[in-house]
């Protein structure tokens, strides 16, 4: 199990260059993982996906996702994390070498890459699709394309890294995902999840460690302190008042996004 993520600060050549220009990354010294499920929470651009990708590459996953034996580095989209990869030290009490890395933004590229490889393979070789339910994931619905690998690849010990998996999961499927995580953690004592997410549903997993990337240095927070939970709670409990205030005076954060 991954226990510590440490930034070897002497290895950083330029603190002004990306990704060290991100406050949460530049302030990182040592992050101790005390739970088998840890969530990275924070607004877009705060570094949660950047750190997750760096951990994945350091561990040996392909940059676009998949298992360690499936190295899809077909694009250069995230090579910018390399300086962080080189400066990280990961400490394990037990390292299985197994696991899965899912990047929501590039997963469909990965599926296309798998289909291309299947077309190129020798006639008697086992197609990659055989390990994903027997047919191309592109033949499934958008939600199934994401969920089927989770169902199939999580049935083992290992390190499972997921970057915003809620992007393709309905609220009902997010609940099903929580059940899947619960079953895996119960069945496999050396299974571990690190998940970058905005989902108030996923963040609500019992006794999970939540690390916030907002407001500077990394720090742990409780579920009730997460922005997604607070926003949804107020929206549900005070919808009309909340929307009136929002429309009358949109926060500067939203204006910047537009």
Q: Which sequence ranges carry the predicted segments?
A:
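Catalytic phosphate/metal-binding cores of nucleic-acid and nucleotide-processing enzymes, i.e., regions
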Residues: 39-43, 55, 66, 74, ...
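Flexible phosphate/Mg2+-sensing switch loops adjacent to catalytic phosphate-binding sites
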Residues: 61-91
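Nucleotide-state sensing region of NTPase/ATPase domains
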Residues: 79-116
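Conserved P-loop NTPase mechanochemical-coupling segment
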Residues: 111-140
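GG-anchored amphipathic helix commonly corresponding to the ABC/SMC/Rad50 NBD signature/C-loop
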Residues: 132, 140-164, 171-187
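C-terminal lobe/lid and adjacent interdomain/linker elements of RecA-like ASCE P-loop ATPase modules
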Residues: 172-258
């Amino acid at each position: 199990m991954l226990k510590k993520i440490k930034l070897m600060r002497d290895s950083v050549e330029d603190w002004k260059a990306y990704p060290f220009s991100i406050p949460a990354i530049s302030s990182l010294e040592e992050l101790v993982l005390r739970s088998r499920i840890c969530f990275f929470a924070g607004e877009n651009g705060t570094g949660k996906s950047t750190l997750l990708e760096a951990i994945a590459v350091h561990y040996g996953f392909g940059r676009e996702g998949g298992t360690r034996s499936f190295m899809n580095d077909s694009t250069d989209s995230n090579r910018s994390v390399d300086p962080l990869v080189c400066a990280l030290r990961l400490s394990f009490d037990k390292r299985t070498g197994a696991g899965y890395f899912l990047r929501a933004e590039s997963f469909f590229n990965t599926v296309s890459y798998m289909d291309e490889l299947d077309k190129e393979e020798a006639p008697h070789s086992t197609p990659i699709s055989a390990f994903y339910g027997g047919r191309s994931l592109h033949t499934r619905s958008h939600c199934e394309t994401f969920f089927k690998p989770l169902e199939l690849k999580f049935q083992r010990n290992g390190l499972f890294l997921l970057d915003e998996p809620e992007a393709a999961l309905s609220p009902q499927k997010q609940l099903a995902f929580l059940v899947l995580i619960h079953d895996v953690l119960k069945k496999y004592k050396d299974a571990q999840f690190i998940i970058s997410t905005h989902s108030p549903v996923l963040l609500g997993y019992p006794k999970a460690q939540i690390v916030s990337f907002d407001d500077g240095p990394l720090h742990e927070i409780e579920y009730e302190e997460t922005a997604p939970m607070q926003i949804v709670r107020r929206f549900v409990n005070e919808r009309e008042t909340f929307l009136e205030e929002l429309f009358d005076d949109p926060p500067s954060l939203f204006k910047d996004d537009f």
